[in-house]
Every structure is written in structure tokens, then in C-alpha cells.
Amino acid sequence: MTYSIRTLTAVMALTLLPVSTPVAAQDISFNERLTKECYSQSDISEASPTRASCIGRSAKACMDTSGAEDHARNELCLQAEYDLWDQMSSGAYFMLEARLEEIDSNSHEGTPSQVILLENMHRAWINLRNTRCTFMQTRWRTGPDARSYEIACLTRETANQFFFLEDEMARGA
């Protein structure tokens, strides 16, 4: 029986993390299953959600129950969503790195190391992501939503990196 990388990654993500995460002492309700289930059903058919539409799904539901004007709780919801995508992205990175180590071990002498190139690319991406999201935060300077914009940016960029890493795995890296 064969499974796609997306299926394996989704199953891994669904089993590694708890279904409902109490994020902090403040009482918020963050259910990561909303994002994970959306993602596992994404891009299957034209009627299914797109991968990008799954970004923030759990945070939105969390904020809807926290109260729109409660900035501190909303930030906790957004932070929990970022943490979820960061964990999924890290898992995909390490899976890809392991696959590339195998490829490197079978490569001809003089061929650039795919693992080293992946590491260099990932460091550059982290720098770009952090700079881009700091820029987004500074656009709002001292407003109550400044930190929320930064976290939302980090989440979006990290989720997109997860998609990239997963696509590389699916291409047979």
C-alpha cells in the first residue's frame, strides 16, 4: 500500500499534537484539528479547500470564541496557529533533510550536497521571513494590532514554507 507524502505528513501531524491545546493561563479555546483537517482535505478536488485557505483556520475559530476586542487573547490564538505551522514545517524539513542525505550518499563526487543547499536555503528563508514580518509589524507601529500582524505574517510565511517542503518531498527529493 502506498501513501502520498501529504497523507503521511497529515497523519503524522494529526497524531503528534494534541487535539485541543490550552495555550496559556488565559482561557482560550484553540483546536488545531480545524487547521489539520482542512489541510488533509485540501486540493483533493475543485470543491475542496485550497491549502492556503487552511492557514489561520484554528486561530479564527479561537478568536471568534475569545471575543474580537480582546487583543491579548487574540494574540494567543494567533501564536498557537503559528506554533502549529512551525511544528509541521519543522517535521517536513527534517523528513526532507533525511531524504536528501540518502540522495547525497548516492551522488557522484563533486556534486553539490543537497543537504547543505537545503540548510543554506532554509537559513536564508528564515531571514527573509523574519525581516518581512518585522516590516509588517512596524507598518502598524504602536497600534494594538501590531504584534498580531507580525504573528499572522509569521504564520502565513511558515505555512507556505511547509507547503514548499512538502512539495519537494512529493517530487521525489
Q: Which residues does each predicted region cover?
A:
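N-terminal signal peptide c-region/cleavage motif recognized by signal peptidases
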Residues: 18-22
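N-terminal alpha-helical modules
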Residues: 24-173
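Bacterial N-terminal signal peptides that target proteins for export
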Residues: 1-11
